[in-house]
């Protein structure tokens, strides 16, 4: 019944799931949920049960919730080795396992998480940056009635499937936390077990799940080309040389800011890749110590993950949302995403910078 509480729950649940699954996967789940909500109201509009004005109200409400969820994936994604693709690369180069990565990032990620949650409450409370759209009780009841109908029609087999998914979800958390196997092996184990226990034995039954990500994949290929050019022309090298020439204490915040600025424009995975390779070279050539290398790795991870919520270019999850089938349905454009992400961008970037300066 409370929009503020609902928004907060979406941010917290998206953050928690992203820490163990991957921000992109969680965004895909959120999109599926929102498409389901959208169709409930689209059918009501078709049957003249709600007015066009009410339908527009619902769309604005869904945009709010979706943006909170998307930012939540970034807040959780920065915390762990599996949250974002570049985290794996950073952990691999630094030689960190799941729990060590979490502990090293915690001085920055935990205060940022709290700041993000406070930001969520404030922008909803004061209805700034086009947030604060409400849903009437009448419209809310339509979701409840639909949920009850789906529950009533759920078969015993479907209930068993849900239990299996829950058990495998717990297996995932324990396997990652205890580092029982490399991350990719754990993922394969889950895919095989899920499909086997749910009786999915044909490729055609899985094919539809991949269609949603095709536009996103096409954009990724373009990004790969851009980064290949950046790497080949050594376009980042002058920036890195300037940063490494500064004092030891200044290197960490400067790396954070440089990574953040570039991650807003280009994809954060590629920015992290280029910068990590450069500091590995610096370590091998004895330009920096191992201790300084670890500090810079934290700055690169937080720098690429936090300020990059500013635009869909930077965060893979945001880009996936923008290219999904949901975005045109609820009227979520590139500029709208940038505008609605702005309060989060400012808060996360500044709190992250303060933590990097004082705690790393």
Regions found by a protein language model. Give the residues of each.
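Small-residue faces within membrane-embedded alpha-helices
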Residues: 11, 15, 68-74, 113, ...
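Juxtamembrane non-transmembrane "cap" segments at the membrane-aqueous interface
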Residues: 80, 133-138, 310-318
